[in-house]
């Protein structure tokens, strides 16, 4: 069983279906012909998240029979991905959905019609410029990570031959401008807040510099800033696509599926002809398009307003996901866990995240309307965290904790104060913040040293708690004032907020001796 069999006229579809593979319900060749002649969507970034999510959503839309165009993928960074993960397999891939039950679902993704290397050194660049001149083109999108939107003075100074992704995209947009100032929507699908603004800032930076240097007319800049022509909508995306999993490879091999080799490029991109991803997914998009759009709502995309996208992001970051992750990271490191899926099976940890989410944070949740906050937390705790295929660790999540506490917990505390809510309802959030002072000590609950995760303030904050000793009966905890009054870390002075003394009391309990983290966590999660 090979993916390219599906491009022949005489493959054994029944064999695939009998082994649990969901096959495309559309004419692949017809979709490719339609897309070549009248393309509607180019996506930059051919990595695992693209194949597992945007491409899969379009595949589902095509399966309805209500749409007939695919997506053209363009790679701006690692061109070997095209040569090794797309071309040998006819641009087909296998999506393996990893269920929390430990089972998998398998679906062939056939929505990608072309895979191009987005750089002038390759012949594909001519094809890309032709596509950008097509009136039919509606949207370009990105999954290139937040770092992919970066640019610098050297690249701005290179003129019309930039190296960075957004410079190349701006050059292609200039081709579209010259073709008749054609409309287009520039859509980020990367997991970063206000992502449309990041794309917009980069594109404007290149265009304005080129205009200043006399390389393009000022009218090109005006075209990019005309929202009747070009828009940069926001989106919120949430789906985990880990590296190809050994267990998945073995399960596919047992089926007789031959395209199961791992691929590592010289730039250390890890991929495969298959992509494995968690079952849960969310993509909420600002509906601000200038030339129509592919009907991705047929595949589950939620189209809404910019304000609602922002509310979904706020719900996730301040209440329903990120704070729970950080609470697990702090206590997971202290209790010796190295896998999130194992940690959530701990009754005390499970109670911690459930009660932070449902009892303490939920009273001030931003309800976006398009997603139910209670259902979002439920899916996170019951499906996503326990998934045995997800290799996430508390140590990874604990990275840069000092930069995260303000958004993940400080915002909730601020809302309690602003709304005059009873701060006595806050027990496990203060306990988590107290746990941070215990975590900074770098000694786990059984007395074993561990290395705290990388953090720009780690040395500074560890020096604050340096006078504290675990198990010392008489010690001065006044150093905590220096920590918990830090507005740059917590978003507010926790003493002024009326929580400083409560947090100090928790810290004293957590420093009482070996086993105190477990006993304190158990006591407060069971009595909460």
Label each region the model flagged.
Residues 1-44, 48-528:
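Substrate/ligand-engaging "lid" and interaction regions
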